[in-house]
């Protein structure tokens, strides 16, 4: 269980800052894949018509988790940077801090 606070003070690489500043933390989420990317256009063209599936579909998945990527936005200059964390099964953003001698909850 990884619990990350919603704000953190860390170094900002922005041209205005270049110092430690307060950052707003959010979790990175991949955007929607474009229909007009060259690979997708080529794949769709190859798939159209008769002949069934033309490229392999990957089945041998090895990993059970993904690396968590944090998106840090500087509160003063709005510069955004990304920070990759280690792999984890449970990730929480801005959850309650642990109390001593309390049972674990998921």
From Swiss-Prot:
One of its GO terms (molecular function) is structural constituent of ribosome. InterPro entries: Ribosomal_eL44 (IPR000552), Ribosomal_LSU_eL42 (IPR053708), Ribosomal_zn-bd (IPR011332). Signal peptide: none annotated. The keyword Ribosomal protein applies. GO terms for cellular component: ribonucleoprotein complex; ribosome. It holds the Pfam family Ribosomal_L44. PROSITE patterns: RIBOSOMAL_L44E. The keyword Cell membrane does not apply. SUPFAM superfamilies: Zn-binding ribosomal proteins. One of its GO terms (biological process) is translation. Confers resistance to cycloheximide, an inhibitor of polypeptide elongation. Belongs to the eukaryotic ribosomal protein eL42 family. This is Large ribosomal subunit protein eL42.
């Amino acid at each position: 269980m990884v619990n990350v606070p919603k704000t953190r003070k860390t170094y900002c690489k922005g041209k205005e800052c270049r110092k430690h500043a307060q950052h707003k933390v959010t979790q990175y989420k991949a955007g929607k894949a474009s229909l007009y990317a060259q690979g997708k256009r080529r794949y769709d063209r190859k798939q159209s018509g008769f002949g069934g599936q033309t490229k392999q579909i990957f089945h041998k998945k090895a990993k059970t988790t993904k690396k968590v990527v944090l998106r840090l936005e500087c509160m003063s200059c709005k510069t955004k940077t990304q920070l990759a964390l280690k792999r984890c099964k449970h990730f929480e953003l801005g959850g309650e801090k642990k109390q001593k001698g309390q049972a674990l909850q998921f």
